Amino acid sequence: MRLQLRCFIATWSFTMVAVAVAADTVRVVETRSVPPEYFAKAAAATHDLKLSLYAFKNSHWKPDDIVNAVVEALPLISQCGVNVANVELRVLDTPVKYRFFSTPVSRELLREFSVTKPALVFVDDTYSRPAYDAEAIGLSNAQERPELSNTIWFAYGAQDLPHAIAHELVHVLSDNGEHSNAPQNLMQPNTAPSNTRLTDAQCNRLRSVAQSNGLITKR
């Protein structure tokens, strides 16, 4: 699948923009939209999801790698009857400090620049301790950091990225930090290529909570 995805990189529609925000502190320097024909489609979808991705100019992350991984993650979400209707990647030109996740600095970034949620943000590293490859922040664990609600932060080098993206999206869409020990379940504590399944109960919660929180729309 990864080889096929590389073939459509050149077909992305992208627009170069230079939008000054907050006294030129943060600028969008590139926007890429992924054609919808590359999105996984659920046979009986009941809801639509729009995903917003954010990367940084001069970061270690490559836009192609980010979007390839996101597209590979989509079938793991569509099994819950949720189709992805739109995926856009914006590359931000910011001070270097914003390329590293930490609660106070990342809150400052999202006060300076408004993101569309749910938002996936790809940073060079994290200052959190213990350091995780990804940090998902739903409504229930954003009470002391409301700017970060419904965002996911991925550190460069995150392992098994497509499965990590799907795993963290389920956390945010469900507003639930719980894991599962069920065999081959996507929400096992450690992601792996063989862990792809979600139960009916997990999908029901995802749809109900995400719709209530305005993260997906009912068809």
Segment roles from a protein language model:
Residues 65-72, 161-165, 169, 202:
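Stable alpha-helical elements in mature extracytoplasmic
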Residues 1-6:
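Positively charged n-region of N-terminal signal peptides that target proteins for export
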Residues 146-166:
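Short pre-active-site segment immediately N-terminal to the catalytic Zn-binding motif
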Residues 23-128, 214:
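Propeptide-to-catalytic entry region of secreted or membrane-anchored zinc metalloproteases
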Residues 109-114, 126-148:
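Catalytic zinc-binding patch centered on the HExxH motif and its immediate surroundings
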Residues 8-18:
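Bacterial N-terminal signal peptides
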Residues 169-184:
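Catalytic Zn2+-binding segment of zinc metalloproteases
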